[in-house]
């Protein structure tokens, strides 16, 4: 989980949930995260489908050089994005909820959480330095 700070807004946080996986349960999990955020009264964008990637490979059936009998396999990785915009404390509580109490999350679905904190503009114009 990475946190980057941007100078705009007033003490708000935008959290992006990047989901990717090979399972057909991925859209269900993305909808469930968005639904839980909307029930909590959090401004939500998504779930947005992102471009999927596919990998294909061919394997010989026999251990010898028989080119007539081969198996072909394909693996598709689907991706979804859900974003929430909320005050810092609410966003932190929702991220903790998603990480701990949102079952069932499949073992084939990976969730990456990216947070962006918007600082008050008064901090930008004061003598404080933001690193």
UniProtKB/Swiss-Prot annotation:
Gene Ontology biological process terms, A to Z: translation
UniProt KW Ribonucleoprotein keyword: yes
Domain of life, per lineage: Eukaryota
Entry GO MF terms: structural constituent of ribosome
Gene3D superfamilies in alphabetical order: Ribosomal protein S10 domain
SMART domains: Ribosomal_S10
Keywords: Mitochondrion, Ribonucleoprotein, Ribosomal protein
Chief localisation class: mitochondrion
Location in the cell: Mitochondrion
GO cellular component: mitochondrion; small ribosomal subunit
Entry similarity comment: Belongs to the universal ribosomal protein uS10 family.
HAMAP family membership: Ribosomal_uS10 (MF_00508)
Protein name: Small ribosomal subunit protein uS10m
Record organism: Dictyostelium discoideum
Lineage: Eukaryota, Amoebozoa, Evosea, Eumycetozoa, Dictyostelia
